Regions:
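Short glycine/serine/threonine-rich phosphate/pyrophosphate-binding segments
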Residues: 16, 39-43, 93-99, 119-122, ...
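Structural motif
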Residues: 29-31, 84-87, 108-110, 146-148, ...
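Solvent-exposed alpha-helices and their adjacent loops that cap or buttress functional pockets
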Residues: 1-3, 24, 79-81, 102, ...
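A short, small-residue-rich loop immediately preceding and capping a beta-strand
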Residues: 78-101, 105-115
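ATP/NTP phosphate-donor binding region
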Residues: 1-84
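Active-site segments that bind and position negatively charged phosphate/pyrophosphate groups
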Residues: 188-294, 298
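A glycine/threonine-rich phosphate-anchoring loop and its flanking beta-alpha core
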Residues: 104-196
Length: 300
């Protein structure tokens, strides 16, 4: 038997107002797990939204990277063990650490992305690293988060470089999944995942530049929401339908090897992935698509 859980999400400047109605079905106590900056950005808004309805037992730093060691350390914190549910707040590495910790504890997980940098908040896969920050591997939970709350105001005030890198990372899904699935006899669910992957790039290419300008100004505009959905939800809709060997390809392989290879500069995940995507498209002879991605990358 196999179950597929599509992402459930709420998006908007008032997205956190929906927390009590959705989360009270799973208990009355919660903890927040995330990074220092992400908790500073989102925690006051979360506390206000749940005041008098859900008791917050504590707020905890996830660690310094998505490692099994950090996830296991979280499982030993008494307040986390006691809480009915966990609120994972932040970017991909904080979220993936909380995802694995809640998998070990068998607790309901709700995610609150404060960056539009990847699809981690809506997927079941956890991308894990060694304590030295080199890539270790990926591992799957039995399901993704129960619900994801995407506050567009919070993301509008997030660091520009993460949103910029998120645009680059999301574009890879459009091409990596069909590339990996080429020639395979796919199940209905896998075929759905491949089709979902091919819905990512249009939103990025149409709204990405204007959305990045909104983040530069710290404002919510009509372009911001569809761009956020194209970074967080659209790739996630593909990921939940396909296995690990279809979920990525050469673009992400180049990033993963980058973490283990001496290199100059400090390049964000999405930036390296987008470079890897252009290498993959060149290798595959998709020159027109490569040039389209290159022009977009240069424009931002």
């Amino acid at each position: 038997m196999k179950s597929t859980f599509f992402p459930h999400f709420t998006i908007g400047v008032d997205a956190y107002d929906a927390i009590p109605d959705i989360c009270l079905d799973y208990g009355k106590t919660a903890v927040i797990v995330g990074g220092e900056k992400s908790r500073a950005a989102a925690e006051p808004l979360i506390r206000k939204a749940i005041e008098g309805k859900i008791e917050l037992l504590g707020s905890f730093q996830y660690g310094d990277d998505a490692t099994f060691e950090n996830a296991e350390a979280l499982t030993r914190i008494p307040e986390i063990r006691k809480a009915d549910m966990v609120f994972a707040v932040g970017g991909g590495r904080a979220t993936d650490t909380a995802k694995w910790a809640t998998h070990l504890l068998k607790k309901p997980l709700f995610t609150f992305p404060t960056l539009a940098s990847n699809c981690a908040s809506v997927t079941a896969v956890c991308i894990m690293y060694h304590p030295d920050h080199s890539f270790k591997g990926s591992i799957y939970r039995d399901r993704n988060a129960y619900h994801t709350f995407i506050n567009t105001e919070v993301i509008a005030h997030s660091p520009r470089e993460y949103f910029w890198a998120g645009l680059g990372d999301a574009l890879a899904k459009q091409y990596e999944v069909p590339f990996s699935a080429r020639g395979m006899d796919l199940t209905w669910v896998q075929e759905t995942g491949v089709r979902n992957a091919q819905n990512v790039a249009p939103g990025i290419l149409k709204y990405g530049k204007a959305a990045l300008e909104a983040v530069d100004k710290g404002i919510v505009t009509d372009a911001l929401e569809p761009a956020i959905l194209s970074i967080i939800v659209a790739p996630g809709m593909a990921s939940v339908c396909i296995e690990d060997d279809l979920d990525s390809s050469l673009a992400h392989a180049i990033y993963n090897s980058h973490t283990r290879t001496p290199h100059k500069g400090n390049h964000l995940h999405g930036a390296v992935v987008n470079y890897g995507l252009q290498v993959m498209l060149t290798m595959d002879g998709q020159i027109e698509e490569r040039d389209k991605i290159y022009r977009f990358a240069k424009s931002i």
